[in-house]
């Protein structure tokens, strides 16, 4: 018999049956705690004696005691037994003496110096070595860390699939200063470094000529480049010099960025290292199979290779014990009881590996490796060492930045005094923590996981950015993207399953593993890992910063590289707010129902094309007060724009090409080349990489305008941003005026073919009914759908060639068969392919019950697809609302009334299932903390309490229906659906019908002068109210 020390009060106090489907070699497993009464545990042959000085604190569920199986709560013990796991027949130490952990594969770590190393890099981590590390590195590199110096750790894999860390020595950081006089610069620098406690690490001052990227200039300035071997010293020195009057440039550029930009390297790709020196195992500073040291000059990048090595991506999910409601990491008893780990090897042939870490015995699960742990502490050590030693390069999960990681790190640090930073890839200056934005930060801010040497991808954040759903629960997203439904388990059932048998814990484990598998499938669906690496490559930033650090850093590093090639240096951002400006506006919609083709044309890459066409940039900007300084410029050398602060000028391309325009031109040319290559590509993997490359370029191009327009950004220039939006508005107005003056005769000249007009429309014409930022909606009256589709491209192309300079381009995007135009950014219509397109429109509130949604959708389908209804809707939209009460309703309109009448009849005769009339609202906090209880779900809570029924817990959704009541408040009508159905309580049919009327009115309002109240009145006028 194999003995577990699953803490009971005496040895072998109770036993759990073995799993039935898959059998172990032993007859049974035992919960056993020999340490409470002085018993000694049997020592496995593979086990060494634990260090007596190390005492481990464990929290044990009381349900592990034989006489308290059904009880909740925990008790604490302290023993010298090190973290332990059980796998099949074996008892394992999580941290054995002969290797770093039970997951480590020491046989792969045969590291020796070689002539050349080909390896792929996925992350770059900056650390600082001091002189006391000299004994651990080669002699010729020691000068780079005396008294201290930067070391860049390049993490990746070799061509033979071994994880590797290449430590690059000799990379410096530098910045620039400008002043009227430099006579005291050397003294000022030394004084500031001494005052701030920084030694002159690799200090070097050099005079050079640079142009400032802060306005148009034809001359360079003498500046000093100050080079150091420490980023913290650079920040302190730059701040100190700025305070005494020096103008500072590029002091916000770290060593990794200098390494990439200065050498034209990449943050993700293949490298060669010449003569790498193997780091002795005793001095290894990274948790990788191999580790080498080299100098910056030994590194060469291979841009031609696009293939990936076999990187490991881990998807994980946790299950927590929440006996008194939703789990809270701050409660000792709300422990983590299971962690599922699904490991997918990118580009590998082997099937993804599923691992379940479980507290307590657990039956075997098919295709899952089950590791059992005596306590949560052992489980956490098992998980942390897996992250560190299994060869994981990327970690994903669902909402892991906001829940799973914070929960795990909270438990580890605050309950067990485990240091998470000991379990990242890096030993020196290691990071592993969750950064949570302070309250009041911009609402889109979210928590970020900082983990040295690991890329974290939270698929919850990815799905929120890419999808538009009513909610973003994993089940909803999986159904939308994968067509799969998640088998869910309520957190209320978790304690019951955990306290049950090993079979019950296996059932819980299956749910846990399932969630991690779904997340891996979502990552594969969106190819997020490839997308973020391609963005990282184009933007010169580490992959781990793509999802967490926003758009600003992407453009900044690219601008830095482009500026460097033309001897510009970037100023530091100015603190303090700049005045705002008017953003993109729209041509106000002419609301109504259009039963005629509506052509939608839009500007391809509007803002990037404006920047290119008008040569907008920091490098071409001339403020009004500075214009007299440039006596060599004529009026034809610059373009003037009237923005809110007065005139602003930009030098034209024939004088100097804008830095931003040059950058955009290079990117877009590269994108065009990639798309051409993509058309010819036959390899599926390479097609995915190329597609993500062109998408990364598109995303980065579209970020340039936003980069200039954020007042608190890295290099804001609101004059550029406002000029861009001004031109966008002007272009929309010009296009509107031009298109509305196009005649049939002129259109035929444009198209070079005969344009057919509908015979019942002797005077065909175009009218712009809406303009939205970069697109125009053109009503094509007197033309058939097929004709509009045929001439759309020609009309758009001709308009852009007549009105605008290259590369501004107008394109035919889509054609609506019919369109309901409500208000700005809100419309519904049927496209030429018969699909319904909705923008900014919720047919009904997302919280509405199923029946209200069904009736509303039925009306929408009728309105968009029934010819009689469409004719009636268009006729009504051209008439005053008051006419509806004076004349007989149109036949098509009566079809809508028939649907409403039928719904009312079904409600009155109780034909609608109660389930379809049910609403639900979350109990977000304890009932007693609500300031008012006159809310439907709280009213039901009170009724359940009065009837002594089981009460919902915090974060439960409380279901309710509305029934007939003598009360005056809506909450008085709320009732528990089960109780209402069992007691045959009549539903509040009039209340539900009113919801239907308002839902339908929300759709039909465009027909009745966009007046929802008037629409409701019209509908009530024609329905049959008993």
Curated annotation (Swiss-Prot):
Reactions this protein catalyses: DNA(n) + a 2'-deoxyribonucleoside 5'-triphosphate = DNA(n+1) + diphosphate
Gene Ontology terms, MF aspect: DNA binding; DNA-directed DNA polymerase activity; nucleotide binding
Keyword field: Coiled coil, DNA replication, DNA-binding, DNA-directed DNA polymerase, Host nucleus, Nucleotidyltransferase, Transferase, Viral DNA replication
Enzyme class: transferase
E.C. designation(s): 2.7.7.7
InterPro entries for the chain: DNA-dir_DNA_pol_B (IPR006172), DNA-dir_DNA_pol_B_CS (IPR017964), DNA-dir_DNA_pol_B_exonuc (IPR006133), DNA-dir_DNA_pol_B_multi_dom (IPR006134), DNA/RNA_pol_sf (IPR043502), DNA_pol_B_thumb (IPR042087), DNA_pol_palm_dom_sf (IPR023211), DNA_pol_type-B (IPR050240)
Pfam families: DNA_pol_B (PF00136), DNA_pol_B_exo1 (PF03104)
Localization of this protein: Host nucleus
Keyword Transferase: yes
Example of a GO biological process term: viral DNA genome replication
Main location: host cell
Annotated Gene Ontology cellular component terms: host cell nucleus
Coiled coil segments of this chain: 664-695
Similarity section: Belongs to the DNA polymerase type-B family.
Its biological purpose: Replicates viral genomic DNA.
Protein name: DNA polymerase catalytic subunit
Species per Swiss-Prot/TrEMBL record: Alcelaphine herpesvirus 1 (strain C500) (AlHV-1)
């Amino acid at each position: 018999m194999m003995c577990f020390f699953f803490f009971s009060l005496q040895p072998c106090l109770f036993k759990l049956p073995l799993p039935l489907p898959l059998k172990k070699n032993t007859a049974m497993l035992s919960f056993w705690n020999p340490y409470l009464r002085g018993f000694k545990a049997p020592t496995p042959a593979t086990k060494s004696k634990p260090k007596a000085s190390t005492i481990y604190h464990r929290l044990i569920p009381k349900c592990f005691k034989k006489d308290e199986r059904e009880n909740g709560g925990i008790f604490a013990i302290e023993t010298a037994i090190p973290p332990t796991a059980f796998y099949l027949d074996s008892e394992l130490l999580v941290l054995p003496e002969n290797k770093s952990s039970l997951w480590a594969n020491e046989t792969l770590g045969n590291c020796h110096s070689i002539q050349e190393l080909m390896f792929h890099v996925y992350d770059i981590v900056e650390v600082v070595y001091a002189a006391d590390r000299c004994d651990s590195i080669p002699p010729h590199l020691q000068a780079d860390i005396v008294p201290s110096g930067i070391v860049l750790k390049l993490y990746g894999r070799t061509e033979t699939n071994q994880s590797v860390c290449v430590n690059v020595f000799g990379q410096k950081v530098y910045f620039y200063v400008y002043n009227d006089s430099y006579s005291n610069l050397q003294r000022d620098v030394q004084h500031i470094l001494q005052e701030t406690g920084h030694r002159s690490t690799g200090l070097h001052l050099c005079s050079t000529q640079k142009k400032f990227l802060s306005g148009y200039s034809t001359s360079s300035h003498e500046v000093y480049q100050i080079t150091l071997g420490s980023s913290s010293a650079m920040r302190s020195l730059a701040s100190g010099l700025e305070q005494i009057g020096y103008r500072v440039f590029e002091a916000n550029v770290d060593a990794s960025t200098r390494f990439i930009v200065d050498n034209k390297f990449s943050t993700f790709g293949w490298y060669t290292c010449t003569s790498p020196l193997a780091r002795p195992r005793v001095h290894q500073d990274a948790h990788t199979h191999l580790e080498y040291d080299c100098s910056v000059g030994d590194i060469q990048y291979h841009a031609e290779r696009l293939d990936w090595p076999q990187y490991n991506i881990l998807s994980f999910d946790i299950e927590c014990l929440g006996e008194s409601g939703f789990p809270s990491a701050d409660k000792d008893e709300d422990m983590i009881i299971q962690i599922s780990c699904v490991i997918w090897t990118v580009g590998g042939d082997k099937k993804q590996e599923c691992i379940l870490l479980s507290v307590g015995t657990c039956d075997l699960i098919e295709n899952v490796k089950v590791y059992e742990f005596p306590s949560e502490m052992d489980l956490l050590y098992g998980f942390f060492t897996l992250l560190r030693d299994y060869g994981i390069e990327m970690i994903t999960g669902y909402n892991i930045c906001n829940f799973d990681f914070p929960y795990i790190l909270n438990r580890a640090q605050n309950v067990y005094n485990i240091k998470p930073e000991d379990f990242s890839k890096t030993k020196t200056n290691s990071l592993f923590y969750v950064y949570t934005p302070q309250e009041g930060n911009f609402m889109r801010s979210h928590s970020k996981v900082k983990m040295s040497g690991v890329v974290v991808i939270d698929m919850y954040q990815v799905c929120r950015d890419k999808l538009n759903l009513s909610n973003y629960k994993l089940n909803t997203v999986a159904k939308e993207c994968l067509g799969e439904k998640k088998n869910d388990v309520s957190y209320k059932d978790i304690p019951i399953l955990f306290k049950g048998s090993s079979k019950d814990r296996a059932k819980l484990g299956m749910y846990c593993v399932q969630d991690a598998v779904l997340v891996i499938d979502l990552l594969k669906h969106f190819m997020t890992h490839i997308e973020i690496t391609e963005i990282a490559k184009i933007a010169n930033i580490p992959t781990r910063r793509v999802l967490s650090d926003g758009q600003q850093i992407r453009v900044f590093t690219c601008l830095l590289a482009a500026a460097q090639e033309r001897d510009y240096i970037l100023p530091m951002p100015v603190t303090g707010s700049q005045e705002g400006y008017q953003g993109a506006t729209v041509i106000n919609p002419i609301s109504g129902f259009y039963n005629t083709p509506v052509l939608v044309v839009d500007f391809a890459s509007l803002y990037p094309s404006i920047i290119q066409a008008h040569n907008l940039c920091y490098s071409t900007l001339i403020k009004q007060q500075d214009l007299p300084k440039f006596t060599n410029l004529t009026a034809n050398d610059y373009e003037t724009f009237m923005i809110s602060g007065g005139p602003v000028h930009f030098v034209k391309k024939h004088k100097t090409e804008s830095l931003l325009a040059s950058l955009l031109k290079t990117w877009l040319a590269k994108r065009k080349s990639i798309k051409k290559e993509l058309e010819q590509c036959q390899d599926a993997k390479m097609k995915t990489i190329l597609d993500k490359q062109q998408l990364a370029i598109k995303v980065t191009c579209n970020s340039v305008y936003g980069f200039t327009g954020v007042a608190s950004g890295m290099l804001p220039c609101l004059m550029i941003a406002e000029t861009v939006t001004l031109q966008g508005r002007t272009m929309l107005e010009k296009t509107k005026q031009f298109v509305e003056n196009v005649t049939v005769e002129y259109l035929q000249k444009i198209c070079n073919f005969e344009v057919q007009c509908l015979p019942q429309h002797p005077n065909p014409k175009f009218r712009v009914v809406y303009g939205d930022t970069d697109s125009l909606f053109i009503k094509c009256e007197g033309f058939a759908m097929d004709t509009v589709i045929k001439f759309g491209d020609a009309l758009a192309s001709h308009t852009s060639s007549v009105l605008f300079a290259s590369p501004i381009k107008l394109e035919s995007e889509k054609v609506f068969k019919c369109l309901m135009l409500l208000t700005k950014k809100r419309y519904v219509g049927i496209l030429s392919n018969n699909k319904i397109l909705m923008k900014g429109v919720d047919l009904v509130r997302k919280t509405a019950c199923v029946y209200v949604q069904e009736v509303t959708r039925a009306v929408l389908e009728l309105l968009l697809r029934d010819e009689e209804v469409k004719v009636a809707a268009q006729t009504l939209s051209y008439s005053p609302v008051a006419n509806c009460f004076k004349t007989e309703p149109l036949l098509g309109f009566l079809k809508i009334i028939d649907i409403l009448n039928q719904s009312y009849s079904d409600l009155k005769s109780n034909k609608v299932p109660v389930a379809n009339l049910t609403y639900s609202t979350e109990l977000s906090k304890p009932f007693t903390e609500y300031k008012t209880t006159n809310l439907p779900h709280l009213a039901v809570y009170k009724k359940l309490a009065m009837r002594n029924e089981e009460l919902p817990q915090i974060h439960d959704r409380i279901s309710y229906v509305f029934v007939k009541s003598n009360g005056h408040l809506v909450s008085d009508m709320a009732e528990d659906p089960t109780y209402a159905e069992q007691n045959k309580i009549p539903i509040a049919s009039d209340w539900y019908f009113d919801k239907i009327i308002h839902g339908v009115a929300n759709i039909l309002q465009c027909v009745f002068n966009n007046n929802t109240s008037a629409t409701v009145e019209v509908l009530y006028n024609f329905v049959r109210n008993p």
